[in-house]
C-alpha cells in the first residue's frame, strides 16, 4: 500500500515536470515566433528606405571625379545637335549637404564657356548658378525654376544634383527582371519644394545597387520622362558609373543622350574652383 502511494506520487511529480517543461517550450516557441514575425514584418516603406541607403553607402568615399562627355539632342522630328562638355564632381564630407558639381561646355562655339555650378542640399533649395558668356553674367537659378530644362536638354535642373537619401520618401513596390538582371522596383517621392515631379519609379539592380532606369511623373501624375542608364564601368574596385544615359520625354517626343568618357578619380580637385565667381574665367 505504501509502495503504491509512493509510486503514484512519483509519477504525478514526473508528469507535472513534463507538463511544465512542455509549457516552457511552447512559451519559448511562441516568443520566438513573435520575434521572427516582428523581424519579418518590414513595411514596403522601410524596405524602400533601406535600398536607398545601400545605394548611397556604396558610393561613399570617392573623393572627387572628372570626365568629358557628349550631349546629343534629338527633337521630335529626329533632327540632332551635338554639344561637348566636361564635368567635375567634388564629394561633400558634410552629412547635411550633398556633392558639388561643375559643368563647362566646350562645343559648339555659340555656347562655349557656358558653365553650370551646383551645390546639392537635402531639403533646403539646391544652390545652382549658370554662367552665359553672351550675357557675361552669372545667373542664380531660382528654386522655383528647378523643374525647368537645362540648356535646352530633357534634363531638368533638379536632375543634375547628387543622389541624397534624405531628399525623398520611399516605397518598395516589387522585384522583377530588368534585362539580364534582377531589380528592386522602388517608388520615391520628392520631399523638397518646387519639384516638377510627384513621384519617380526607380529600377535598382540587386547585384550592385546601380540605378538602371527611372520613370518621372509630372504634377498631373502623368508619365513625363524615362531615364535609362547603361554601359556601367567600375572604378577603384568600388564605384560604378554609367557611360551612357538617355532621357526620353514622352510628352514632347524629344530625347537627350549623354555619352561619357572614362572617369578619373581622386585627382585632388581644388574646392576653390567650385565658386560662382570663378565661372566667368572658365573656358
Where are each of the predicted segments found?
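Short, ordered beta-strand-loop transition motifs
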Residues: 91-97, 173-182, 235-237
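Bacterial N-terminal signal peptides that target proteins for export
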Residues: 5, 14-26
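Short, solvent-exposed mixed-charge patches
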Residues: 282-283
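C-terminal segment of classical bacterial N-terminal signal peptides
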Residues: 31-40
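Gly/Pro-enriched, hydrophobic low-complexity segments
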Residues: 106, 117-119, 127-131, 137-141, ...
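N-terminal mature ectodomain segment of secretory-pathway/periplasmic proteins
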Residues: 44-134
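Surface-exposed beta-loop interaction hotspot
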Residues: 164-168, 175
Amino acid at each position: 500500500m505504501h509502495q503504491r502511494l509512493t509510486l503514484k506520487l512519483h509519477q504525478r511529480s514526473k508528469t507535472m515536470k513534463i507538463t511544465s517543461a512542455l509549457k516552457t517550450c511552447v512559451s519559448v516557441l511562441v516568443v520566438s515566433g513573435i520575434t521572427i514575425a516582428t523581424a519579418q514584418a518590414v513595411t514596403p516603406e522601410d524596405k524602400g528606405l533601406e535600398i536607398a541607403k545601400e545605394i548611397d553607402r556604396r558610393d561613399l568615399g570617392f573623393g572627387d571625379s572628372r570626365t568629358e562627355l557628349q550631349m546629343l539632342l534629338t527633337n521630335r522630328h529626329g533632327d540632332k545637335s551635338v554639344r561637348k562638355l566636361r564635368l567635375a564632381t567634388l564629394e561633400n564630407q558634410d552629412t547635411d549637404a550633398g556633392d558639388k558639381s561643375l559643368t563647362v561646355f566646350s562645343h559648339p562655339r555659340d555656347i562655349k564657356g557656358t558653365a553650370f555650378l551646383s551645390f546639392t542640399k537635402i531639403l533646403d533649395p539646391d544652390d545652382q548658378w549658370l554662367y552665359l558668356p553672351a550675357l557675361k553674367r552669372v545667373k542664380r537659378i531660382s528654386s522655383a525654376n528647378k523643374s525647368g530644362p537645362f540648356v535646352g536638354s530633357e534634363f531638368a535642373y533638379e536632375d543634375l544634383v547628387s543622389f541624397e537619401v534624405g531628399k525623398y520618401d520611399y516605397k518598395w513596390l516589387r522585384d522583377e527582371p530588368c534585362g539580364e538582371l534582377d531589380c528592386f522596383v522602388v517608388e520615391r517621392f520628392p520631399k523638397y519644394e518646387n519639384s516638377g515631379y510627384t513621384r519617380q519609379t526607380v529600377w535598382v539592380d540587386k547585384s550592385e545597387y546601380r540605378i538602371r532606369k527611372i520613370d518621372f511623373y509630372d504634377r498631373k501624375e502623368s508619365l513625363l520622362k524615362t531615364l535609362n542608364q547603361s554601359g556601367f564601368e567600375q572604378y577603384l574596385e568600388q564605384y560604378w558609373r554609367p557611360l551612357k544615359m538617355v532621357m526620353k520625354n514622352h510628352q514632347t517626343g524629344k530625347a537627350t543622350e549623354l555619352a561619357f568618357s572614362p572617369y578619373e578619380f581622386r585627382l585632388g580637385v581644388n574646392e576653390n574652383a567650385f565658386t560662382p565667381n570663378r565661372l566667368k574665367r572658365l573656358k
